[in-house]
């Protein structure tokens, strides 16, 4: 473990040291960032930092150094705070300078008060992000991060599990002890909000007594607080993230790894409750709007903790088996990549066999599933996203659990995924598109607010006859736009705003999908197990964990490989296409050439080759020929139904 735990348990003390040395000179801020950056470079240091993803909030010490793996769900308006402020001792008149960065509550002793008129006060700006755990993150990803984390934590003395669980009992106690409740609110009145920093005259007393007020505050909310997770059933903490530097580098839906100082000060809840009380004196309509915005933007810290960011990085991926940044020229990263690439061929062969079994013995469908799983939008030409490869697996058995168990297999392979059961009920009632709530001044999430490289599996086999209402039609349109243009149009009431995305869409259906797809492959099962669940479970249990991890590394790593086509091969492909057009002018089109080039690209990358070879081009033609022949055969059997 890194020597000296102060930077983990008392980071504000470290910051205070730099501030004391440099005073109002802004260099102290750069030195703080550099200090923590160097600390995290020490051997295995990041593993010793407690993570909000893995450690319950009540086990984390307030104002300790933590990390959080998250997606930016919303960005609030910038806020002003007191970067530097001065306190005056009421008895001795002694003046002390304090820093306000990385704090929600201003520090002042029992006999001190903030001098609001001090010429040395500095007002600065910070940005607030609303961040949620990565939507659809696979269980194996969570488990790997938990196993890697070596942070030693125990229940915090100021925020214990028993106190958290007794919230309703605390509320009853408050009713029975009105004098105690009155005293607490008297204490709260000594607090105030100045320049984005809460300040108080008796911080010790408020901190210890505020827990009951905090629970009362959360119980008094007009409705249960919605953590605004994009996907149903998601768990984990949402956080208000205060960003001080380079916030323009980040955007909504980015996946970030944050290192910063945890703020769960109970005083925040009392102060926010008081602000709601004060707003009730205003016009009723204005009061309602302000109260709703206040409720959303300043929720109880016990529900939505604050993180004051010291360091933040955008994550290329969330696969814990790979180095975080794959395009760095670090020797460690290069060694890992080159080592894995040297054994790529047997990994691909094993993965192909594994997916062939999962697809009931269909090796051609398994080939296309591999190509789909490593596909990614690598660039955009005008509005056209290049590299997307949506696959429609038709011929899936109806009234079977096959599609459900196939999704479970995919879940075990990719870092993040979601299965959308395409029923009339779901299409008509689920919220797909994020929309702006102007009353609360926040972006309300929808199912399609997903980070890059999420696998979205759409199961059409559950679709029955029925009527789509207007929201249902809008949802189908949203899915079509996502597949075709890799974008989601967020609803801002008065206008729509395009949010580009990079989502891998895989559609399972009985006949041809209602949705557009880049490629349709018709399933030809070679076996039909009498017990699908037992068959799929035995398939998963037969794979060694080490082999499964190789599959996971393979599918993530190949997305980031560069790819090119030499002039020589380009000429050969053009000549070949001209020859194909001569032989079959009716059915070979420019779209077919584009499809062949996409298949050839991902076929090459799946073999670890970053340039197209003649051999891979011929193999791509062979695969496409087999796929088209199978579709034609199915068309002959079922008429126009594919």
Swiss-Prot record:
The modification Phosphoserine is found at residues 154, 167, 298. Residues 151-188 are annotated as: Disordered. It comes from the Eukaryota. GO terms for biological process: cell division; DNA-templated DNA replication; sister chromatid cohesion. GO terms for molecular function: chromatin binding. Keywords: Cell cycle, Cell division, DNA replication, Mitosis, Nucleus, Phosphoprotein. Residues 151-161 have a biased composition (Polar residues). It is found in: Nucleus. GO terms for cellular component: nucleus. It holds the Pfam family MCM_bind. The modification Phosphothreonine is found at residue 160. InterPro entries: MCM_complex-bd (IPR019140). Belongs to the MCMBP family. Interacts with the MCM complex: associates with the MCM3-7 complex which lacks MCM2, while it does not interact with the MCM complex when MCM2 is present (MCM2-7 complex). Interacts with the RPA complex, when composed of all RPA1, RPA2 and RPA3 components, but not with RPA1 or RPA2 alone. Associated component of the MCM complex that acts as a regulator of DNA replication. Binds to the MCM complex during late S phase and promotes the disassembly of the MCM complex from chromatin, thereby acting as a key regulator of pre-replication complex (pre-RC) unloading from replicated DNA. Can dissociate the MCM complex without addition of ATP; probably acts by destabilizing interactions of each individual subunits of the MCM complex. Required for sister chromatid cohesion. This is Mini-chromosome maintenance complex-binding protein. The gene is MCMBP.
């Amino acid at each position: 473990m890194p020597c000296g735990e102060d930077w983990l348990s008392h980071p504000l003390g470290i910051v205070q040291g730099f501030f004391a040395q440099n005073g109002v000179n802004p260099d102290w801020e750069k030195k703080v960032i550099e200090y923590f950056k160097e600390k995290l470079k020490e051997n295995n240091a990041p593993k010793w930092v407690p993570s909000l993803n893995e450690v319950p909030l009540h086990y984390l010490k307030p104002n300790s150094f933590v990390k959080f793996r998250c997606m930016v769900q919303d960005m609030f308006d910038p806020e002003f705070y007191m970067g530097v402020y001065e306190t005056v001792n009421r008895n001795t008149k002694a003046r002390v300078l304090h820093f306000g960065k990385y704090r929600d509550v201003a520090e002042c002793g029992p006999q001190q008060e903030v001098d609001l008129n001090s010429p040395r006060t500095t007002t600065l700006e910070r940005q607030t992000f609303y961040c949620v755990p990565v939507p659809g993150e696979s269980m194996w990803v969570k488990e790997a991060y938990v196993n890697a984390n070596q942070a030693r934590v125990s229940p915090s003395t100021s925020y214990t599990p028993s106190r958290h669980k007794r919230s309703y009992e605390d509320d009853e106690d408050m009713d029975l002890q009105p004098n105690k409740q009155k005293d607490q609110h008297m204490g709260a009145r000594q607090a105030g909000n100045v320049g984005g920093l809460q300040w108080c005259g008796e911080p010790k007393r408020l901190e210890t007594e505020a827990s009951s007020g905090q629970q009362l505050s959360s119980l008094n909310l007009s409705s249960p607080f919605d953590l605004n997770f994009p996907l149903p059933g998601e768990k984990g903490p949402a956080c208000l993230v205060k960003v001080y530097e380079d916030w323009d580098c980040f955007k909504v839906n980015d996946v970030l790894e944050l290192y910063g100082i945890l703020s769960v000060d109970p005083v925040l809840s009392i102060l926010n409750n008081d602000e709601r009380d004060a707003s009730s004196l205003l016009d009723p309509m204005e009061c309602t709007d302000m109260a709703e915005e206040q409720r959303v933007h300043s929720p109880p810290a016990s529900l939505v903790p604050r993180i004051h960011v010291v360091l933040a990085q955008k994550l290329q991926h969330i696969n814990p088996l790979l180095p975080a940044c794959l395009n760095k020229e670090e020797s460690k990263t290069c060694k890992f990549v080159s080592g894995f690439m040297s054994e790529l061929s047997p990994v691909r062969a094993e993965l192909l066999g594994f997916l062939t079994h999962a697809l009931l013995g269909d090796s051609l469908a398994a080939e296309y599933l591999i190509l789909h799983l490593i596909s990614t939008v690598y660039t955009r030409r005008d509005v056209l996203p290049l590299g997307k490869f949506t696959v429609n697996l038709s011929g899936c058995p109806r009234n079977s659990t096959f599609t459900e168990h196939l999704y479970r297999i995919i879940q075990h392979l990719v870092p993040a995924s979601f299965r959308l059961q395409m029923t009339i009920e779901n299409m008509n009632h689920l919220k797909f598109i994020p929309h702006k709530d102007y009353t609360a001044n926040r972006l309300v999430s929808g199912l399609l607010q997903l980070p890059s490289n999420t696998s979205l599996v759409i199961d059409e086999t559950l679709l029955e006859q029925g009527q789509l209402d207007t929201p249902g039609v809008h949802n189908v349109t949203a899915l079509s736009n996502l597949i075709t243009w890799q974008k989601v149009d967020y609803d801002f009431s008065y206008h729509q705003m395009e949010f580009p995305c990079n989502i891998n869409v895989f559609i399972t259906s009985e006949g041809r999908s209602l949705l557009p797809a880049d490629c349709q492959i018709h399933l030809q099962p070679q076996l039909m197990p009498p017990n699908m669940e037992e068959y799929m479970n035995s398939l998963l249990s037969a794979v060694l964990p080490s082999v499964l991890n190789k599959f996971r590394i393979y599918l993530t790593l190949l997305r980031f490989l560069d790819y090119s086509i030499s002039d020589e091969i380009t000429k050969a492909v053009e000549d070949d296409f001209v020859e194909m057009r001569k032989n079959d002018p009716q059915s070979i089109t420019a779209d077919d050439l584009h499809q062949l080039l996409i298949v050839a690209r991902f076929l090459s990358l799946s073999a670890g080759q970053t340039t197209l070879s003649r051999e891979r081009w011929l193999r791509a033609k062979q695969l496409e020929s087999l796929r088209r022949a199978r579709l034609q055969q199915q068309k002959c059997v079922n008429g126009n139904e594919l």
